[in-house]
Amino acid sequence: DQAAALHAPRWNDPALRHLSWLDRTTPAAAAATSAIVASLYPGFVERFGPGLAPEVLDGLERGMARIGDWWRGVPGAATVLHGDLRLDNLLLGEGSDDIWTVDWQTVVVGNGVADAAYFVGGNLLPEVRRAHEDDLVRHYHQALVDRGVADLTWDECWARYRHGTWHGVYLCVAAAMLVEQTERGDLMFSTDIDRHVRHALDLDAFDVFDRFDESTIPGASRG
Protein backbone atom coordinates (compact mmCIF):
# COMPACT_ATOMS: atom_id res chain seq x y z
CA ASP A 1 0.00 0.00 0.00
CA GLN A 2 2.78 2.45 0.86
CA ALA A 3 4.57 1.84 -2.44
CA ALA A 4 1.34 2.34 -4.36
CA ALA A 5 0.65 5.52 -2.39
CA LEU A 6 4.03 6.84 -3.54
CA HIS A 7 3.71 5.76 -7.18
CA ALA A 8 0.06 6.44 -8.03
CA PRO A 9 -0.18 10.26 -7.64
CA ARG A 10 2.40 10.99 -10.37
CA TRP A 11 1.77 7.93 -12.55
CA ASN A 12 2.37 8.81 -16.18
CA ASP A 13 2.44 12.51 -15.32
CA PRO A 14 3.79 14.36 -18.40
CA ALA A 15 5.42 16.94 -16.13
CA LEU A 16 7.93 14.33 -15.00
CA ARG A 17 9.52 14.36 -18.44
CA HIS A 18 10.81 17.84 -17.68
CA LEU A 19 12.66 16.69 -14.55
CA SER A 20 15.74 15.66 -16.48
CA TRP A 21 17.85 15.55 -13.31
CA LEU A 22 15.67 12.68 -12.06
CA ASP A 23 15.15 10.80 -15.34
CA ARG A 24 17.62 7.95 -15.85
CA THR A 25 15.75 6.51 -18.83
CA THR A 26 17.02 8.96 -21.46
CA PRO A 27 19.61 7.50 -23.85
CA ALA A 28 22.43 9.65 -22.46
CA ALA A 29 21.58 8.94 -18.83
CA ALA A 30 21.09 5.23 -19.49
CA ALA A 31 24.46 4.96 -21.23
CA ALA A 32 26.26 6.86 -18.48
CA THR A 33 24.66 4.92 -15.63
CA SER A 34 25.22 1.50 -17.18
CA ALA A 35 28.85 2.39 -17.93
CA ILE A 36 29.46 3.42 -14.32
CA VAL A 37 27.97 0.23 -12.91
CA ALA A 38 29.85 -1.90 -15.44
CA SER A 39 33.13 -0.23 -14.44
CA LEU A 40 32.51 -1.16 -10.80
CA TYR A 41 31.67 -4.78 -11.52
CA PRO A 42 35.22 -6.25 -11.69
CA GLY A 43 35.93 -5.04 -8.15
CA PHE A 44 32.56 -6.30 -6.97
CA VAL A 45 33.00 -9.81 -8.35
CA GLU A 46 36.56 -9.95 -6.98
CA ARG A 47 35.24 -9.18 -3.49
CA PHE A 48 31.99 -11.12 -3.48
CA GLY A 49 32.29 -13.67 -6.27
CA PRO A 50 34.09 -16.37 -4.26
CA GLY A 51 31.21 -16.48 -1.78
CA LEU A 52 28.42 -16.80 -4.34
CA ALA A 53 26.79 -20.05 -5.36
CA PRO A 54 27.74 -21.07 -8.92
CA GLU A 55 24.22 -20.52 -10.28
CA VAL A 56 24.07 -17.07 -8.70
CA LEU A 57 27.45 -16.05 -10.10
CA ASP A 58 26.41 -17.32 -13.54
CA GLY A 59 23.14 -15.36 -13.37
CA LEU A 60 25.01 -12.27 -12.26
CA GLU A 61 27.47 -12.57 -15.15
CA ARG A 62 24.62 -12.95 -17.63
CA GLY A 63 22.78 -9.95 -16.21
CA MET A 64 25.85 -7.74 -16.19
CA ALA A 65 26.53 -8.61 -19.82
CA ARG A 66 23.18 -7.01 -20.71
CA ILE A 67 23.18 -4.01 -18.38
CA GLY A 68 23.22 -1.54 -21.26
CA ASP A 69 20.18 -3.19 -22.82
CA TRP A 70 18.37 -3.12 -19.48
CA TRP A 71 18.89 0.59 -18.94
CA ARG A 72 17.96 1.45 -22.52
CA GLY A 73 14.79 -0.60 -22.14
CA VAL A 74 13.54 0.68 -18.77
CA PRO A 75 9.77 1.11 -19.21
CA GLY A 76 8.93 4.74 -19.90
CA ALA A 77 9.21 7.47 -17.28
CA ALA A 78 6.02 6.49 -15.52
CA THR A 79 6.33 7.84 -12.00
CA VAL A 80 8.58 8.81 -9.12
CA LEU A 81 10.21 5.88 -7.37
CA HIS A 82 12.30 5.72 -4.23
CA GLY A 83 15.00 3.53 -5.76
CA ASP A 84 16.20 1.93 -2.50
CA LEU A 85 12.98 0.74 -0.90
CA ARG A 86 14.09 -1.66 1.84
CA LEU A 87 13.42 -2.19 5.52
CA ASP A 88 16.47 -0.14 6.55
CA ASN A 89 14.79 2.87 4.95
CA LEU A 90 11.40 2.48 6.63
CA LEU A 91 10.35 3.83 10.01
CA LEU A 92 7.50 1.86 11.55
CA GLY A 93 5.08 3.35 14.06
CA GLU A 94 2.71 1.63 16.44
CA GLY A 95 -0.18 1.46 13.97
CA SER A 96 -0.26 -0.75 10.90
CA ASP A 97 -0.43 2.33 8.64
CA ASP A 98 2.25 4.31 10.49
CA ILE A 99 5.11 3.93 8.02
CA TRP A 100 7.57 6.63 6.96
CA THR A 101 10.06 6.25 4.12
CA VAL A 102 13.49 7.86 4.58
CA ASP A 103 16.77 8.19 2.64
CA TRP A 104 15.72 9.70 -0.68
CA GLN A 105 19.16 9.99 -2.26
CA THR A 106 18.27 7.40 -4.92
CA VAL A 107 14.94 8.92 -6.00
CA VAL A 108 14.44 8.75 -9.78
CA VAL A 109 11.76 8.91 -12.45
CA GLY A 110 11.10 5.59 -14.14
CA ASN A 111 9.45 2.21 -13.72
CA GLY A 112 7.71 2.45 -10.36
CA VAL A 113 7.07 -1.28 -10.26
CA ALA A 114 10.83 -1.72 -9.84
CA ASP A 115 10.41 -0.43 -6.28
CA ALA A 116 8.02 -3.29 -5.58
CA ALA A 117 10.36 -5.85 -7.17
CA TYR A 118 13.30 -4.49 -5.19
CA PHE A 119 11.40 -4.56 -1.90
CA VAL A 120 10.01 -8.07 -2.33
CA GLY A 121 13.21 -9.50 -3.79
CA GLY A 122 15.60 -8.03 -1.26
CA ASN A 123 13.68 -8.03 2.01
CA LEU A 124 12.20 -11.51 2.00
CA LEU A 125 13.95 -14.84 2.27
CA PRO A 126 13.75 -16.55 -1.14
CA GLU A 127 11.48 -19.30 0.16
CA VAL A 128 9.14 -16.75 1.73
CA ARG A 129 9.12 -14.65 -1.44
CA ARG A 130 8.28 -17.64 -3.59
CA ALA A 131 5.36 -18.55 -1.35
CA HIS A 132 3.80 -15.08 -1.23
CA GLU A 133 5.10 -13.17 -4.26
CA ASP A 134 2.06 -13.47 -6.49
CA ASP A 135 -0.30 -12.31 -3.74
CA LEU A 136 1.95 -9.39 -2.81
CA VAL A 137 2.32 -8.10 -6.35
CA ARG A 138 -1.39 -8.50 -7.04
CA HIS A 139 -2.12 -6.50 -3.88
CA TYR A 140 0.26 -3.77 -5.08
CA HIS A 141 -1.36 -3.72 -8.52
CA GLN A 142 -4.84 -3.46 -7.04
CA ALA A 143 -3.68 -0.67 -4.74
CA LEU A 144 -2.49 1.27 -7.81
CA VAL A 145 -5.84 0.74 -9.51
CA ASP A 146 -7.70 1.82 -6.37
CA ARG A 147 -5.65 5.03 -6.35
CA GLY A 148 -6.61 5.92 -9.91
CA VAL A 149 -4.01 4.23 -12.11
CA ALA A 150 -5.97 3.07 -15.15
CA ASP A 151 -4.88 0.98 -18.13
CA LEU A 152 -2.09 -0.82 -16.28
CA THR A 153 -3.20 -4.41 -16.71
CA TRP A 154 -2.08 -7.15 -14.40
CA ASP A 155 -0.03 -8.72 -17.20
CA GLU A 156 1.77 -5.44 -17.85
CA CYS A 157 2.35 -4.89 -14.16
CA TRP A 158 3.87 -8.35 -13.86
CA ALA A 159 6.06 -7.76 -16.91
CA ARG A 160 7.35 -4.53 -15.40
CA TYR A 161 7.89 -6.33 -12.10
CA ARG A 162 10.04 -8.98 -13.79
CA HIS A 163 12.01 -6.22 -15.50
CA GLY A 164 12.49 -4.59 -12.11
CA THR A 165 14.22 -7.63 -10.61
CA TRP A 166 17.46 -6.41 -12.20
CA HIS A 167 17.20 -3.03 -10.48
CA GLY A 168 18.29 -4.67 -7.22
CA VAL A 169 21.18 -6.47 -8.88
CA TYR A 170 22.66 -3.36 -10.46
CA LEU A 171 22.05 -1.15 -7.43
CA CYS A 172 23.77 -3.69 -5.21
CA VAL A 173 26.85 -3.81 -7.45
CA ALA A 174 27.14 -0.03 -7.49
CA ALA A 175 26.39 0.61 -3.82
CA ALA A 176 28.77 -2.04 -2.54
CA MET A 177 31.68 -0.44 -4.38
CA LEU A 178 30.81 3.20 -3.73
CA VAL A 179 30.27 3.18 0.03
CA GLU A 180 32.91 2.66 2.70
CA GLN A 181 33.64 -1.03 3.11
CA THR A 182 32.64 -2.50 6.48
CA GLU A 183 32.11 -6.02 7.78
CA ARG A 184 28.39 -5.36 8.23
CA GLY A 185 28.17 -3.84 4.76
CA ASP A 186 29.88 -6.79 3.09
CA LEU A 187 27.49 -9.17 4.83
CA MET A 188 24.50 -7.11 3.74
CA PHE A 189 25.63 -6.81 0.12
CA SER A 190 26.50 -10.50 -0.17
CA THR A 191 23.01 -11.34 1.09
CA ASP A 192 21.41 -8.76 -1.18
CA ILE A 193 23.12 -9.89 -4.36
CA ASP A 194 22.24 -13.52 -3.64
CA ARG A 195 18.56 -12.64 -3.12
CA HIS A 196 18.24 -10.30 -6.09
CA VAL A 197 19.95 -12.62 -8.57
CA ARG A 198 17.90 -15.57 -7.33
CA HIS A 199 14.82 -13.40 -7.82
CA ALA A 200 15.73 -12.82 -11.47
CA LEU A 201 16.56 -16.51 -11.90
CA ASP A 202 13.29 -17.65 -10.33
CA LEU A 203 11.30 -15.44 -12.70
CA ASP A 204 13.55 -16.30 -15.67
CA ALA A 205 13.90 -12.58 -16.25
CA PHE A 206 16.47 -12.74 -19.02
CA ASP A 207 13.96 -12.05 -21.78
CA VAL A 208 13.29 -8.57 -20.38
CA PHE A 209 16.47 -7.24 -21.97
CA ASP A 210 14.77 -7.50 -25.35
CA ARG A 211 11.19 -6.86 -24.31
CA PHE A 212 10.97 -3.19 -23.44
CA ASP A 213 11.35 0.04 -25.30
CA GLU A 214 9.40 3.27 -25.02
CA SER A 215 7.60 2.73 -28.31
CA THR A 216 6.01 -0.54 -27.19
CA ILE A 217 5.10 0.12 -23.58
CA PRO A 218 1.49 1.19 -23.20
CA GLY A 219 1.34 4.21 -20.92
CA ALA A 220 -0.65 3.78 -17.75
CA SER A 221 -2.89 6.75 -17.10
CA ARG A 222 -4.67 7.97 -14.03
CA GLY A 223 -8.45 7.84 -14.12
Where are these regions (language model features)?
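ATP/Mg2+ or Mg2+-diphosphate-binding catalytic cores
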Residues: 167-223
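All-alpha amphipathic helical-bundle segments outside canonical DNA-binding/catalytic cores
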Residues: 149-165
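Active-site activation/catalytic loop segments of kinase-like enzymes and analogous catalytic loops
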Residues: 106, 112-149, 165-187
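ATP-dependent phospho-/nucleotidyl transfer catalytic cores
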Residues: 1-82, 94, 200, 210-211, ...
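Generic recognition of stable, solvent-exposed alpha-helical segments in well-folded globular domains
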Residues: 1, 39, 80, 85, ...
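Catalytic activation segment of kinase domains across protein kinase-like and atypical kinase folds
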Residues: 86-122
